[in-house]
Amino acid sequence: MKKSILLGLALVFSIAACQQKERYTQHSPEIDTFKKVIVAYENQDWDALASHYADTAKIMYNKLEKNAMTKAQLLAMHKQDAEAFNSWEFVNGESEYEMVVTDKGETWVNFWGIWKGDFKPTQKTYTIPAHYTARFANGKIVKEFGYWDLSELMLDFQKIQAEQKLKNEETAITETQNSDNEL
């Protein structure tokens, strides 16, 4: 009888151990969903991209959670950014995905990739490492953080803006001088 009880307990514990959810993997439905998000972003398929986010999703790209974007704001930002680029993509073969389940039972997908985009104002191609981490619930992204360094692109853009401002000022001065000479 004692052996039967011990054997039964051992069987229960081994079954329970086998049923624990995997806490780390590089293959999961959530990773597959995030890959679809990346493809939709690259193809500028905003409806497909939006379909993977919960309506109440909070999105933080290089900002604190208190300044989170909504799904609608994310789509508006992507559409505006798309106007400024001839093309963009994440470099093939340079991306890594992983999924982790936290001690609290939260499911997060991490993505590391190399983003490459041809910026219209500078006619220059920028290559920027990027990291995203997205929390999933019920198959949808409910929270997403993204981190990358845009300093090179921004400095180049500011230089173009400063040059344009100088040209505008020179034009205004020339027009004023011409107007004064006519009087």
Where are these regions (language model features)?
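Sec-dependent bacterial lipoprotein signal peptides
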Residues: 1-18
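Short, low-complexity N-terminal intrinsically disordered segments enriched in polar/charged residues
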Residues: 18-43, 47, 164-182
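A short acidic/glycine-rich loop-to-helix N-cap element
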Residues: 21-25, 122-125, 152-162
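Short, well-ordered alpha-helical segments enriched in acidic and aromatic residues
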Residues: 45-60
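Short beta-strand segments enriched in hydrophobic/aromatic residues
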Residues: 53, 61, 113-117, 132, ...
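A short gly/proline-enriched turn/hairpin at secondary-structure junctions
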Residues: 58-70, 83-84
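Surface-exposed, charged secondary-structure patches
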Residues: 76-122
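Short beta-strand edge/turn micro-motifs at domain boundaries
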Residues: 127-158
